[in-house]
Each structure stands twice: as structure tokens, then as C-alpha cells.
């Protein structure tokens, strides 16, 4: 086990441990200015007992703006998780390093990267899983199992074995989880509201909505913070990619494009309801006939 991993992982059985490639430090936010939004900062002081605030960082504009806003509003953040499928776009991996430097400079914890593992503790990427099973990412078939297994699952297992989270749950309280839905995405929060209220483990908050930050406001906040704009966060073989994004991948990252085509070719014999990564069309037929 890597020396950079949390000490507590030594006490977790291999079949249940989610490895982290970067440790996170606890710390309060150092910031100035007036705060008009305090959904948890006040509650942490009023309720007493154990508390922990976590952010699921996706590497895109909304979750980046969320971290910036939490800092501006002096709302403590104790843990920032990024679930790595192993197939993120290169610009996403590069932005994680940029964001880590910004977080460190602003007294916030660095990003803890987690990923799916097999029962014997080996890492399992989404790409490897698809190649082994001869299938495409489940979103190609209209499902979201790839996100559940490689994004939500690893973060949930990490929290289940993270002592500060366990301590909160043992005390009978909920872990506070900040969600980066912007002010233009009320339809998303409305759909999950009842499920959130019934969640025995997490109290979920939507700060961007309460601040009134829509997509444009998020972009402005990132610019004002002196950060470059993050690119779209997704796997390089995501069936939801638009044609121009696929062409951009082919032109700038031909090796990754070939890997996406190899996944599609590998699954071809098993495809019954879709044509390929484009769902109703094949990436190879439309964009990659000349690629071997």
C-alpha cells in the first residue's frame, strides 16, 4: 500500500478498501468578506457534536465554482473527493493539479482521488471493465450504471471507511454533502428532494442554487478567482459526446480515439440494441474508418 495513503486504510480489509492516490488535510478556510449564505457554518456551531462537510468534485465548471463559493462564504470544507474512472479526458487530469494548487493556497483540503477496485484490491477502470465484458459503457444503452459503479460507488465506499464520517454517523448525525447543481438546474434537485430527505447518512445542500449562481455566474466566479475554465468532464469514450467533441478527440488525442474505437470493435458482436458508441451510429463508421 502506498505511503501516501491514509493511515486508517491499514485497518480496512482489502475487499472493502477504496484506494486514494492523494491524501487530504483537514483545515479551516481562511477568507475575508461578508457571508450571506450559511446553511452549515451556523449549524456546525449550533448543533454541537461531530460534523464533517464533503464535496464531490467532478472537475467541471459547476463543482469548481462550488468550491470557490464555499471559500468566499467561509463555509468549512473537510473532504473533497474526485472519483477517477481511469478514462477521464487529459484536460480533466491537468485541471485537478491546477485546482489542488488553488485549494492549498486558500487553506482548503486537496482533492482526494478514489477509484473502483476489485474484491482483491486491484484497480478496475471503466475501460478495462468494458473490454473484459465485451460491452460499451452502460449509458450507451440508456442506463447510468457506469456512473453508479465508477463515480458514486467509490466515493461511498471511501466515506463508509473514513473515520471522521463514521464518527459522525455513530453520533447519530448526518454528513453534510454539498451538491454542485447550479441555479438553472432546479429540475435536478426537485427529482431527488424526497430521496434526499429520506437519506439516513447525508444531509445534502445545493449552495449554487441558494446563491442564485447559474451557469454564467459559475463561469464568472472561476474567472474572478484567477483560474482557467475547466473543460467538459467526461470519459474520452463517453457515448454522450457530441460530434464536434469526438472530432476534437480524434484530432488532438489520436491514441485515446483509437482506444475508444478498440472498445467499440470489441463490443460489436454483442451489440443488439445500439450501433456503437454513438448509440444509433458507430464512431468507427462515422469518424474513424481510416484508423486501424
Where are these regions (language model features)?
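Short, cysteine/histidine-rich loop/knuckle motifs that typically chelate Zn2+
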Residues: 1, 19-22, 237
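Short, non-ligating residues that shape and space the ligands of small metal-coordination modules
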Residues: 2-6, 23-26, 244
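Short linker/helix segments within small regulatory modules
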Residues: 3-15
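Short metal-binding segments enriched for Cys and/or His
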Residues: 15-40
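Nucleotide-activated chemistry modules centered on ATP-dependent adenylation/adenylyltransferase
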Residues: 44-292
Amino acid at each position: 500500500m502506498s505511503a501516501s495513503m491514509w493511515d486508517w486504510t491499514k485497518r480496512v480489509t482489502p475487499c472493502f478498501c477504496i484506494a486514494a492516490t492523494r491524501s487530504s488535510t483537514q483545515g479551516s478556510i481562511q477568507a475575508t468578506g461578508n457571508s450571506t449564505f450559511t446553511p452549515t457554518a451556523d449549524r456546525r456551531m449550533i448543533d454541537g457534536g461531530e460534523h464533517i462537510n464533503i464535496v464531490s468534485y467532478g472537475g467541471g465548471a459547476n463543482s469548481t465554482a462550488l468550491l470557490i463559493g464555499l471559500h468566499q462564504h467561509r463555509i468549512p470544507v473537510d473532504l473533497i473527493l474526485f472519483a477517477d474512472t481511469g478514462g477521464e479526458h487529459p484536460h480533466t487530469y491537468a485541471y485537478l493539479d491546477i485546482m489542488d494548487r488553488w485549494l492549498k493556497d486558500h487553506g482548503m483540503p486537496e482533492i482526494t482521488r478514489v477509484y473502483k477496485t476489485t474484491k482483491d484490491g486491484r484497480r478496475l477502470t471503466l475501460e478495462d471493465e468494458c473490454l473484459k465484458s465485451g460491452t460499451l459503457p452502460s449509458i450507451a444503452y440508456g442506463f447510468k450504471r457506469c456512473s453508479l459503479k465508477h463515480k458514486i460507488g467509490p466515493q461511498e465506499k471511501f466515506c463508509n471507511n473514513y473515520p471522521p464520517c463514521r464518527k459522525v454517523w455513530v453520533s447519530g448525525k448526518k454528513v453534510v454533502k454539498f451538491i454542485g447543481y447550479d441555479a438553472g438546474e432546479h429540475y435536478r434537485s426537485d427529482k431527488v428532494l424526497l430521496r434526499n430527505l429520506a437519506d439516513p447518512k447525508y444531509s445534502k445542500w445545493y449552495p449554487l442554487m441558494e446563491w442564485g449562481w447559474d451557469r454564467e455566474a459559475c463561469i464568472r466566479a472561476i474567472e474572478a478567482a484567477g483560474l482557467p475554465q475547466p473543460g467538459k468532464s467526461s470519459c474520452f469514450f463517453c457515448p454522450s459526446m457530441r460530434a464536434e467533441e469526438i472530432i476534437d478527440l480524434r484530432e488532438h488525442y489520436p491514441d485515446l480515439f483509437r482506444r475508444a474505437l478498440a472498445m467499440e470493435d470489441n463490443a460489436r458482436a454483442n451489440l443488439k440494441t445500439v450501433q456503437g458508441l454513438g448509440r444509433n451510429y458507430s464512431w468507427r463508421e462515422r469518424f474513424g474508418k481510416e484508423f486501424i
